[in-house]
Structures are given as structure tokens and as C-alpha cells.
Amino acid sequence: MSKKQTETNRKKDCRLAACLTAEEKLRLLTAAGGFETESFNGKLPVLRAADGPCGLRIETAEFPKGAPARCYPAPHVLANAWNPRVAERVGQALASECIEAGVDVLLAPGVNIKRTPLCGRNFEYFSEDPFLAGQTAKSYIDGLQSAGVGASLKHFCANNREWERLYQSSEVDERTLMEIYARPFAMALQAEPWTIMCAYNPVCGVYASENPWLLKEILREKLGYNGVVISDWGAVHDRSRALKATLDIEFPHAPASLDNLKEGLEKGAIAQADVEDSVERILSLLKKKEAAGERRKALPVAEREKIALDAAREGIVLLKNDGVLPLKGKVRVLVAGELAEKPSCTGGGSARVTLMAPPSPLSAELKKRLPQGEFPYLAGYSYSSCTLPLALCQSTGVKKARLAAFESDAAIVVAGNNQLTETESYDRSSLRLPPEQEKLILALAEENKNVIVVVEAGAAVDMTPWADRVAAIVYAGFGGEKINEALASVLSGETNPSGKLSETFPLSLSDTPTGEERGNGFFERYKEGVLAGYRHYDFYDLPVLFPFGFGLSYTRFGYSDFSLVQTDAGAEVSLTLTNEGETAGAEVVQIYVEPCHAPVERPRRELKAFEKVFLKAGEKKRVSFSLRPSDFAFYSVVYHRFVVSGGVYKIAAGASSRDIRLLGKLRLEGDF
């Protein structure tokens, strides 16, 4: 927007603000109800917001937990696709759902870093890596807002576990905040989200909703955000302090806040200028909403369903395959596990989606693609038994499944978590699958050497008790309402899997950056600093079950002809990628920067670029990347900005963080 346009808009906002009384301006700073702003008898347009990142959750008298809605793959599945276009298309589809429901702002996406795999909301978040999270979130927002529906980027900031999230302070140092936890927000801000939502938790002892260092100094001054900041629902503790920190709209309506603001003005805790600045930002948002009306055109339902299916397929990660996949021809395969019939489409809490209709069973979807095959189904466990101390009928189910597995060519076990075990407000107590599921996997593995385990979960799970006893492992995540169609497509070979892990799968909880610690209820120190996710495992040379960026295919890819050219603007990296197999497929080329020497402790390597490349069998393609000076930088607490240290850097190209195929070096002068 030009300076002239900005000034014109400012004058219009001033005229609109002049129509509001002093009390109306204060009332504008808190919502009119649960999810909408004040209109003052038609003086202002109403802004309506709704959850959530995987599909709409709109509560009604008839549907108190949310009216039936279309369910899309969860954000972590979009990140596992490693394809920003997938996230953009899902954003466009979600915008269509909002348009039909009269929603102006979707309360998504969340870009909080997956600091611990136990966090109950990890399924809502993209990655343990800020670059991958930021890139995917930016595309999600671009898609959503291209159709005239605003995004609410959340939860700013350092909201990385659900346990005691309302009270426990995240004690994080400035460098760690800027390099890891604020970084995905900074990248997503390139998409100009309409709003940003603050977190519930305190940061360095001050609630995020009223933290001037966090909202004013970091978000607005350092990151350059000048839009509306809204609260998470019930996150405001002192409305005047929140306003002083530049929080604009409190959700939901809080009757006491009006008196709090009046008292704040009387006592000088806030100034009228603070009110006017916030009102101006809100009016600009309302005007943006009105101007977006002409872009609000919903996609056809059939197109949205295809987007959901494509995203679920592309986000599936093949973790192990001893040759049993893809399934072919006249084959008899036992399909076991209640989740095969009643899949985990998404997690619980505000991101929960009430399905329009139950997904088609996995056995039925496999039969469609392999009509000569047989796919008998046995539960083997019921999910209620996984959460109760006694499961009296469990042994009978396992006995039947054992016999069926013995009589089959292969057996598929669908295991994982659901909306009760991965949900807002609670963290998981363990990385392990429910014991009944592990027992079923091990029992079938004793009867059949071709056991295929499908895992539906929103974050890493501990597979060590059974991973080496099965023939294949497929990580589907929470794939939305099309999850079984997507799974059948991959298992049958109709789709070649191309997903990669957006987080490390550790060998044990004690190996993770946070270990088994979770704070004391009052505060939690981010002692690992910038060594989040794979940075931690690589720095300490820890073995992992599956590394960040890992994922198999039904074909093979070769990397060759590496070129690294240093330029005034940074560096140009290129290589040749070849599909060396007999099946078309896609590979994610990942570029990591490795500082050889540094004045501060730095991660061994960090992701700085990636591209998903689709190749026919035998096809080759030249893939190029541009690295900027900022890709070599770290945050200096001395200068309070990102700086580049002079010295030698390695540029690594690979198929995962631990599968480096090509390597080059360059020397930078740096800032000092």
C-alpha cells in the first residue's frame, strides 16, 4: 500500500472514529459476545470469528460442541507434506467454509514450535523447526486471505505445552525467543495476517496478554506488525495493562473490562492516546473486512473435497518398508484396529471438528482400489478399552485377530491417539501408544511377518517396542475426513508416498530437549536454548528413531552435480535430482547451513531452504536455491539484532537432517 493510500485510509478511520462516543470506543476494545465485535446499532460492521485450523467449529443450541463441518488435515500433516502449495490450497478451502458460514476471521493457524512431543496441541502446530513452520503458515494464510477471510496467527508466544498453560511462565531468553519461537511468526507476517492472537501463558513472568516487551517491543517494533492483536479466550487479566501492551480486542465479552478501562484512564495507567491507537487499528481491520467482500467466493464442494484428499495423501509419511508395500493384486490382508473403522481425523479442544458423516472404512477403500483382494476387518481393541484400567473383552479380540493374521498374506494394524488423548488443555502423559494397541501389534507380528502399522497421531510416538518386529510403518497423522481414502491410495500404490517428518521421532522421552521435565507450575526454564528439535539431537549426537525431514518412497532418488556459487547477495545453490526408480514420485530436497566456527553456541545445522520436486521414472531435474545473508545469521543479545559472523560455512543438501547427500563450503566476511 502506498503512503498516499495509507494516509487516505487513516483520514477515513479518523472520520469513522469521530462517530463513536468515548464510551463506545472503550466498549470496542472488548467483544460483544463470544466470537463477534460490537456494532453500536449499525454504526460499525460486525467482525465474526470462529475456530479452527482443521475445519469450522461453530457452537449452536442444537450442536453445543460444534455444528457438523468439513474436516481437513491438521496443520502437522500439511507440514509433513513439505509443500507450501498444499497449505495454500487448504487455506483456500477453509476460506470457502468460512464464507458459507458468514465467518470473517478464522482463528488459525498456530505456529507454536513443537518443543516437546507431549504437548496436547501439537497436531495444531506445524513443526519443531521455525523455518518449515513459518513457510507453511505463510502459505496457509495466503490461501485463506486470498478469498477475503482473515487469519489469526497464534499463539504469541512461547505457548509450547498445555500443562499449566494458564499460569506457568515460559522463561525464555531473548536470543532463543527471536531465533526459535518468534521466528515462525516473523516469517508468517509476510502474508500480512489480519490479526494475531496472544497466548495464555506468562512469558518471563508477565502474562502474554499484557506483556509490553512481547507485544510492543518484539511483535510491533522488531517484527513490524501494525495490525490488530486479539486475546485468546479469557486470557486477559487486567484490561488496562493489556491495552498498554497494545492488545486491541479482548475475547470473549468481559463486562468488568469497561470499568477497568475507565479506572485506568482516571488513574493514568493508560492514556486516551492508547485508546485511540487501538480503535484506529480495529477500524482499519473492519474496513479491510468490508473491502474483502468482492473476493469472498466459495469454491465448489467437489473441489474442496479434492483439496482435502490431496493434502491428506501428500502428508502421509512412509517410515519403514521391507518390501511389503505397495499391496498388489489378489491379496488377503487383515485390517485390524478400531481406528481403521473410526479414524482419528483430528484432535480435541477448540480445533475439534464434528464430522458431517463418518469416513468410509479403510477396508472398503482398499477393496475399491484392489478389487481382487480380500480385506477382512477385526477391531482387536476398542478405543474405550485403551482409556480404562480394565478391558475384559480384549483377549477375545486379540485371539481372533491372531488367527486372521495367520491366515492372511499381510496384516494392517491402525493404531494411534484420538480427540481424548491429544487435545487442548492437556498434555500426553507418555510417548507410547495405548498398551492394548501395542499388544495387538506384537501379537499379530508373531503370526505374520508382513505386518503394516499405520499410526494416527498428532506428534511423535515411541515405536521402539515394536518397530523392528513389523514390515512397514506408515505415519498418517490426523488426516481429516479423507484419511482412509488417502491411506488406501498410498497402501495400494495408487499414490507414491512423498511426505517427510516435520519433527524428530526420538527413541525415548528422556532424549528430547525438555526430557521428562515440565516446569513446576509456576515457571519453566527453556534451558535447551536454541537447541530445539533436531538441533538438540544433532548437537549432542543422540541416536533417534526417525530424523527430522525423513520419509521413504516407492522409488529412489539420486543427488548429483552440486554447485555452490557465492554472490554479493549470499549464495546460489544448485544440484541435479534424478528419479532412479521405475515409479513416478516426489522428493523433498532440503538445504541446511552448518557454521564451522561461531562466537556463540550454535546448532550444528539448520534448515534454510527446501523444495518438493515431482519426477517421472528416470527423469532428472536441476534444482536451485538462493541463500541470503540472513540465512547465516544468529541473534546477538549485544546488538539486539540478527548478525552474521565471519568464517567458513558448510552448505548441505540432503533427504533429511541426517541423510546429507552433497556438501559444499564458502567463506563469509560477516558483520564482524
Task: Show the residue positions of the predicted features.
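Glycoside hydrolase catalytic-domain context in secreted enzymes
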Residues: 1-637, 643-658, 672
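Extracellular and select intracellular beta-sandwich modules with Ser/Thr-enriched
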Residues: 660-664
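Short beta-strand edge segments in extracellular beta-sheet folds
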Residues: 665-671
